[in-house]
């Protein structure tokens, strides 16, 4: 972040994570871009500062025209590349901002904190309960704070100006794994009787953006250097511009607009990764013909590794009814069957093209110990019938008005799912020997990226092959965590071959390592080679070099070292 010398606005991106919106790194959310787009439209200078940058090197809060804090992370999650702003940090920013400088706070976390009783006393402070961008625009025009909603015209304007704003051009991840979350629509087709725990029905009847509008915005983002895009804002990919949203319990999917959008985005050669998010199993199951056509389009246009999150939440009929959940177990199985029919085939990066993800929530009203048994019975049926599920996500309900969770039942359910399903799913989907391309390395030793991982030495080629552990992921939605038992330069790509499995992660080793430079730690990471064997290989190579000899292939090298070539993995893919 480069601070301006003259008075300017400071935009603090505290990140958003909503049921239908990602904005935690490597994602850049659309709401923060709209806020920056307002300032771009007014031609007002500003600084963009992600909260992770603020923690390391906080910019000055003085000499400001105003400060905007976006806090929108409300979905419980474990974050590896960035951490959303907390209420404590929000309070500190407000307290440290000079009293004469206006402060605007927006996002669903702000609304949640206020609902829980947070009511800070400070002049020139406003907590936006509608659209933060429109509220800021009103302030800039009228010099007064007032809750506002953006118009359709403003939506288009700020989306397009936000696409070329500092939230993109000065984003720390722009030259790396930055994924541009684009808003396709807002609201939910179940706005009348939507899931009780979810914020999306509160947004009302869906308001669509046209394919042309979205494609134009993404094209501008590509001009700024964006390569990866996720279709966000959609509670259900299959109901984009659906028919009968107001009249029908199960609106009829419309294959043409989503096909126009997806093919229009894919036609731009600058686009690399394209993913989407949610799907409503009940809509799919009750409209199989239209849903099948849309599924084919998704498989044709999305990058492999795409996941459709299915929010079953609970297979217990009593919980389903008490919480107005969006599908039952029968509808879920029909939807999973359809996605599996077309999406299981693997793509260029080594992953299945499109698979369903399954969400469960604990603590919903009506839940009993038997609820967990019903959930497990459904999972076992799906497994027995041969359905492939990309991930099973289990979380606890947030908010008021729900019941206490039996911790023993919850932990038992969670452990059983991890043992019986998560691990076996990974082993079936990515058996040992599978090659995955474009794994982006993010951290050393631990899974979470820390400030020290941003230092030049962590990114230096000098660390390659040294002792340690490296973690990384492919770019895209819900990526699988990859661990490697030696160091690799961070913020770089590798192709890897799978060597083992955890409950929700895999271990691997890079392909194409040179026979002349592969290190002892890299050799030890190959299944079938012990630490002693690795030292024998390194020693025999050193002796050969002393005699001005080189090994032409792994067979000769292993023979000279008195070792057998491992037969559990293709050694020629690893050593060349």
Model-predicted segments: where are they?
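Acidic, low-complexity intrinsically disordered segments
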Residues: 2-213
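Conserved SAM/AdoMet-binding glycine-rich loop
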Residues: 9-12, 219-367
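Flexible glycine/acidic-rich beta-alpha junction loops that bind and position SAM and/or redox cofactors
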Residues: 19, 77, 110-115, 196, ...
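Catalytic cores of alpha/beta
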Residues: 114-120, 290-295, 364-383
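Terminal RNA-binding accessory module
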Residues: 418-512
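Small-residue hinge/turn detector
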Residues: 530-531, 564
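Residue-level signature of tetratricopeptide-repeat
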Residues: 536-551
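Alpha-helical interaction/regulatory segments in DNA maintenance proteins
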Residues: 539, 555-576
